[in-house]
Design a protein with these regions (language model features):
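Key DNA-contact positions within bacterial/archaeal DNA-binding proteins
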Residues: 21, 32, 60
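Recognition helix of helix-turn-helix/homeodomain-like DNA-binding domains
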Residues: 28-43
């Protein structure tokens, strides 16, 4: 089974001293999407793209797919 991890996003936010509420505001996504990100649950590609715009990065810089055994 495969799962998604947003640990890279958490590190990027910490490195840029950005709180989740600030990211929600500038990337324009809902508290529901923020909760899903926090729980390592899938979110829409649109949300990921807006986050990438904020950090000027690629999707692979904010998340990764992990194979669970």
């Amino acid at each position: 089974k495969m799962k998604i991890s947003y640990n890279k996003l958490q590190k990027l936010m910490a490195d840029n001293q950005m709180k989740r509420s600030d990211l929600m505001r500038v990337a324009e996504f809902s508290p529901y999407a923020a909760t899903k990100l926090n729980k390592n649950e899938p979110v829409s590609l649109g949300v990921l793209m807006r986050i990438c715009e904020v950090f000027h990065c690629d999707i692979g810089d904010i998340c990764e797919v992990i194979l669970e055994e």
